[in-house]
Amino acid sequence: VGSEMCIRDRPKHVITVIDEAYLEFVTDENCYSMLKLIKEGIDKPLVIMKTFSKIYGMAGLRVGYAITDPVMADHFGKSSNAWNVSFIGQKTAAAATLDQEHVSMVKNINAQERDKVTKVLRSLNCKVYDSQTNFILFKAPIDNMKVYAKLEEQDVLIGAPIGMNRVSLGKPEMNEKFIKIMKEILS
């Protein structure tokens, strides 16, 4: 509701761009797409960006899209390259949209893994920030660079520690390896 109010209350000359790359991972019912504002015909420029890189697992194909009103879409059409997405990317993305059962499965597995990893990190006295995505931001009770280095020694790569660590969730067996190493590091 807060985000929606900010969009509605902004001046008409301000273009709002919302990146909903991770929205498909969200399980919190209070989080929702701003697409409804475009459907309602909001009288302010709004662009919603989506990607096939996250829940669809198609990062290598570099496929995404924007949803906006007809006036903004016309501006995009005049300034974009007609060949900015490969044929394979287009066909694969189109096919992926038809398999919502797979998207639902990925979302459910991600939520289970996110909850499991979060609980373990908290049990190891890490400060864990609530997440609705496929990654977890945490601060270990020891130097984050040490955590990063110890994980790297065992071929587990996480986001570079700039005050905190960021671990992307993977397949359950990859997450188990991360948990096992974290227990060794912090025990």
Question: Predicted segments — roles?
Answer:
Residues 150-187:
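PLP-dependent enzyme catalytic core of the Aspartate aminotransferase-like
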Residues 1-7:
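Short, small-residue-biased leader/transition segments that mark boundaries at the very start
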Residues 9, 68-72, 99, 140-143, ...:
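Short loop segments at secondary-structure junctions
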Residues 110-111, 120-154, 169:
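Conserved PLP-binding catalytic core of the aspartate aminotransferase-like
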